[in-house]
Each structure stands twice: as structure tokens, then as C-alpha cells.
């Protein structure tokens, strides 16, 4: 039996001097022990997800905790059967989550160490979900929400996180005077965003401490009131959260049947994320439209070594055709 792989999800807002140099040092250590993953380091802190066997991940956690700046850093641990990453990246960025307040004329950035929403543990958050007078706001990207979300949570009409402040300003009259609680995958986005809401004048702002990942592991709530699966930014794509009464809410793009399998459209210039079974991915050569399925840069065709004839036959089977100028 192969050894279990541990996936570590973590972040910490803390001032890091010479953050760019520290990022290079961090990458060197990770590579030296064979760790895989993706880590962002900025002047404001660190945010990462990494994977490896028990020994490797333990070495990494011990090394991180040996630095007094990260002595109390909270690692959220998942056990998996295979690696969640193929390579190791450590990058220096302006922010460890891209809210982009300064770039989008929202005044100065937020320091969560100074201003942030009230921390709610899983039990308190569940109570908020059941409270009709509380507004629950999902702060993640739209495609994350579509895979899974808390029951009754608002889905902002946004494509990504940095669009959220404008959406809130456009809709603040709907919940300005209400209690608002926010949530995200591991907590890092909510730390900053809930602080921004406080600065905007919202009087009662809470956040799920530790994020969805912690809610799903809590022995008391066991992920209850979560519908679907949780999107993660690694090779797993999704992980289960609700261990009481799990459901599948996402539907196959092609036939509408329950499906939690995300793929990217075969056309690299589209790249739309869609839910598709392996059968339908094959049938529709992973394209979200006739134009994408017949695109000359069709990645599915290239990855699977389909000849032009095989490609044309796939399209003919669904009533479409391959233009004369397109070649495999």
C-alpha cells in the first residue's frame, strides 16, 4: 500500500522584511526536501498550499515553525492518496491575496492585523447560517461557488475576488444595516475583505475562522449545511465538506446530469471551466461550443493524438463538421 500524501493549507498575515529574498530562500528549502506546491510571499505575509509524504511535510512544518514570525502558523492538513501538485513554486507578490484595493481606487489596502471581522468558529458560523436576519456572503470566485457553497449564501455577480468590493458598494443598501458574515476556502481572503467591510461602515461583520476547510473537519458540525464540494487550486480540483448529508449540486454542461468534474474548454483562447463527465468530454472533445470544438488549436485533439479523420468523426456524431482549413 502506497504511503498517504498530506496536503497543507495555510496562511499568515505578518510583516516580512526583505520578502523577495525570503521567497528565494523558501523555494530553495522546499526543493531540497522534495516538497511540491504553490506559495505566495509578500511584504504582508505568506499564503500557501503544499503536498508531500508525512516525513517531507513534517520537515516543512517544523522548519516554518522554527522561524519566530511563523511559530504559531496554523496548518490545515488533508490526507490524500496522491500528490496534489506536480511542481514547486514560491513567488513574491504584492499581496498574498489579490484584492487590489489600491489598483481599483478603493483607497489604501487593508491590514488584517489592524482591521478585520469578528472570528466565528464552525458552531457559531452554523448558527449564523440558520439565522434569517444574517446575510451570508461567499467571497470566492464564481466557478468556486458553482461547485459548492453554504446553503442560502449569496453568490455575488462577479468573476473574481478583486471585483467583490465594487459589487458590495453597488449592493450595500440591501444589507448595510444587517449582520454580515463572510467565508472563503481557508480564511485568507476573508481576513482582508471583512476588514474592508468594517472600514466601509458595516457595523456587524463576521468571518468563518479557518474557512470552509476547517468547517468540514469540525467534529461537531461535520460540514452540515454545505451543498456540493469545495473547489481547491490544485490537482484535486474538489474535496468533500459535508459529512452529514452530502449532495451534488453542479450539473454536467452537456446533459445536465449531476457532475462535479471540472474541465477547461479545449480552446485555449476560451478556456471556460465547465462540468463534464469523462464520457461527455470524449464525445464533445472537451469543447464548450461548436466553434471551440472545431478550433484549430483544440487541446483535446492534440493531447489525445486524434487524426483529422477521428476528429471529424467525433464532430459528425453530434451533428457538427470540421471546417476544411482546420487540420489535426
Swiss-Prot record:
The alphabetized list of GO BP terms reads: tRNA modification
Looking at the record, the residues that make up the Rhodanese domain are 130-224
Cite the entry's keywords alphabetically: Oxidoreductase, tRNA processing
Q: Which CDD domains match?
A: RHOD_YceA
* Residues annotated as the enzyme's active site: 184 (cysteine persulfide intermediate)
| Transmembrane helix among keywords | no
Catalysed reactions, semicolon-separated: uridine(34) in tRNA + AH2 + O2 = 5-hydroxyuridine(34) in tRNA + A + H2O
Q: What is its EC number?
A: 1.14.-.-
- Which Gene3D superfamilies does this entry report, sorted A to Z? 3.30.70.100, Rhodanese-like domain
Identify the domain of life. Bacteria
Question: What are the GO MF terms of this UniProt record?
Answer: oxidoreductase activity, acting on paired donors, with incorporation or reduction of molecular oxygen
Which top EC class applies here? oxidoreductase
**Which family, according to UniProt?**
Belongs to the TrhO family.
Function, in words: Catalyzes oxygen-dependent 5-hydroxyuridine (ho5U) modification at position 34 in tRNAs.
- According to UniProt, the name of this protein is tRNA uridine(34) hydroxylase
Please report the organism this UniProt entry assigns to the protein.
Streptococcus pyogenes serotype M2 (strain MGAS10270)
What gene, per UniProt, encodes this protein?
Answer: trhO
